[in-house]
């Protein structure tokens, strides 16, 4: 018989840097999960990734207080900022441009995000990432 699911907890945690402080501690503490066990498992799973990169994670908490978790790819905006070498997007993306990004970089990001995105093909995913880039005030170059 399958375990009974008590809750799903969605968080963004820095890769390799999970610790019991907020937001991890309070979110998991409410569900009665062993926080240190999650932190150790998460840090072990993300140690191959760049430290500090925010990683979305969905934690499934079961009625017996055990848990499983699934890590996703970093948000597109974070990958775009890293590729363009900027700290933050534009407050007025239609007027103020903050950086430039090439189509090759967009395609690379789309391939990284492919596992978590829904799209017919890599071109459709690239166009989706391109829209995110434009809304951040990045200029897309061919």
Curated annotation (Swiss-Prot):
The keyword Ribosomal protein applies. GO terms for cellular component: cytosolic large ribosomal subunit. Keywords: Methylation, Ribonucleoprotein, Ribosomal protein, RNA-binding, rRNA-binding. It holds the Pfam family Ribosomal_L11_N. The keyword Ribonucleoprotein applies. It comes from the Bacteria. One of its GO terms (biological process) is translation. One or more lysine residues are methylated. GO terms for molecular function: large ribosomal subunit rRNA binding; structural constituent of ribosome. Belongs to the universal ribosomal protein uL11 family. Part of the ribosomal stalk of the 50S ribosomal subunit. Interacts with L10 and the large rRNA to form the base of the stalk. L10 forms an elongated spine to which L12 dimers bind in a sequential fashion forming a multimeric L10(L12)X complex. Forms part of the ribosomal stalk which helps the ribosome interact with GTP-bound translation factors. This is Large ribosomal subunit protein uL11. It comes from Klebsiella pneumoniae subsp. pneumoniae (strain ATCC 700721 / MGH 78578).
